[in-house]
């Protein structure tokens, strides 16, 4: 552990179009090599596709997708007497959100559609209706935690 103070959390400004803090964090996560304008173009393009495909509010679809992807428990390795146990622990709210955003992006990038706009649109719609790779990842994480429930007394 570091002997210094914990680093201060930086303030994230809400995104320009919808004024949403979580969406701003998502855009920052999509961004590669500091190209924020490109990331905004991709995310807003996906939102326009969602609006035209479903007729629903894209911000609501985004938040529904994120809620369906956020994990509530995960396993962490704990070494006890020469053996390493996978101990289930509850996920902090800030980490829960970060994992949800990361998984949405990772599984959108792995999809087979041609453009990132199409991939993000597909992943948002799938996750909002409890399908897709990111939702499967959350379920696998929960399954791992459930399988290792016997080691929960090693929690720290």
Curated annotation (Swiss-Prot):
Keywords: Ribonucleoprotein, Ribosomal protein, RNA-binding, rRNA-binding, tRNA-binding. Pfam families: Ribosomal_S7. GO terms for biological process: translation. One of its GO terms (cellular component) is small ribosomal subunit. One of its GO terms (molecular function) is rRNA binding. InterPro entries: Ribosomal_uS7 (IPR000235), Ribosomal_uS7_bac/org-type (IPR005717), Ribosomal_uS7_CS (IPR020606), Ribosomal_uS7_dom (IPR023798), Ribosomal_uS7_dom_sf (IPR036823). CDD domains: uS7_Bacteria. Coiled coil: none annotated. The keyword RNA-binding applies. Belongs to the universal ribosomal protein uS7 family. Part of the 30S ribosomal subunit. Contacts proteins S9 and S11. One of the primary rRNA binding proteins, it binds directly to 16S rRNA where it nucleates assembly of the head domain of the 30S subunit. Is located at the subunit interface close to the decoding center, probably blocks exit of the E-site tRNA. This is Small ribosomal subunit protein uS7. The lineage of its organism: Bacteria, Pseudomonadati, Pseudomonadota, Alphaproteobacteria, Rhodospirillales.
């Amino acid at each position: 552990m570091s002997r210094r103070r914990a680093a201060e959390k930086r303030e994230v400004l809400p995104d320009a179009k919808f004024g949403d803090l979580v969406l701003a964090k998502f855009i920052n996560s999509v961004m590669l090599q500091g190209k924020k304008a490109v990331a905004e173009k991709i995310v807003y393009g996906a939102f326009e596709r969602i609006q035209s495909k479903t007729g629903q509010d894209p911000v609501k679809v985004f938040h529904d997708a994120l809620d369906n992807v956020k994990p509530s428990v995960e396993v962490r390795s704990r070494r006890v007497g020469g053996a390493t146990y996978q101990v289930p622990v509850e996920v902090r709210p800030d980490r829960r959100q970060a994992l949800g955003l990361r998984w949405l992006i990772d599984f959108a990038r792995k999809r087979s559609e041609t453009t990132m706009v199409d991939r993000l649109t597909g992943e948002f719609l799938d996750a909002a209706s409890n399908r897709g790779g990111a939702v499967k990842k959350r379920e696998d994480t929960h399954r791992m935690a459930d399988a290792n429930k016997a080691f929960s007394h090693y929690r720290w």
